[in-house]
């Protein structure tokens, strides 16, 4: 009877009861145990009442009991078997792992999408390159056609790069035209000026003995080597002219003066000098509708005015200056827009958009 009573007493003593008895024997309160174990008072109370928290894992619950047993000096081997009988270990719920084949399907689909994306990118790049190449070939063919046309026109015109019509013969004025020369001396006299000298020689002997000086001629003026002898009935001697001619021959050998700078013999001082090539250039450049082009490199050019007449068609060398005048507006076709600068009536013409696009320039200048 005593053995059965002791077994019943052992079974009724749960881990919570034994822990409470040990705590009370040491004179500790639940608050003191909670502070030493760094737990809540409610957790200590649940352990002594053998209440397992539903949201607390069994592993943590066993750990709390072990710490409590060490604090009140109880052996763990006596409490753990009782605890296993009272609250068996619950199996942890583990979520089933996804199949490896599912991950492979995702990777396969992602790889297919990436391949399709790269294919689209390559197609777009290929189309862009083909479009650029076609435009480039078209521009090169157009430039080659223009050059062939220009070469054909040059061969037809005998090597002259500027074919002009009769109405526009003064459109291009030569800037470096030399003065006519005879026997090493400039010949500024025309038929009109020669007759003027002849008539003046009959009226005054001072005209043949001295040359009038203007502001544009230095004091050592040139005198022609040959003496002009007027064909008149005058009996005035010409020895004075011969003497003056001999005196000035030494100065005439070392100086060269253009016809526009030396006044005509026998002409009045208030008569204006004869026009030169420079005056023609300035007049055409400053006229209304003037078109001036400065070339920095070789360039093919074609200029057509409003009447449909071709003012210029050909290749200009670098460093050349082209002055054109016709009826505005002008239609220009330029093979290399970056090789020249254009000004119309003194205002520059913008060619930047053609230079950036690197293509043949077709524009109209002088549109009001």
Curated annotation (Swiss-Prot):
Annotated Polar residues bias: 229-243
Transmembrane segments: 112-132
Domain HTH cro/C1-type: 19-79
Residues exposed to the Cytoplasmic side: 1-111
Domain of life: Bacteria
Protein name as annotated: Cytoskeleton protein RodZ
Chief site of localization: membrane
SUPFAM superfamilies for this protein: lambda repressor-like DNA-binding domains
Residue spans binding DNA: 30-49
Cellular component GO terms held in the UniProt record: plasma membrane
Source organism: Yersinia pseudotuberculosis serotype O:3 (strain YPIII)
Subcellular location: Cell inner membrane
Compositionally skewed regions (Low complexity) per UniProt: 193-221
Region of interest: Disordered: 151-243
PANTHER family in alphabetical order: CYTOSKELETON PROTEIN RODZ, PTHR34475
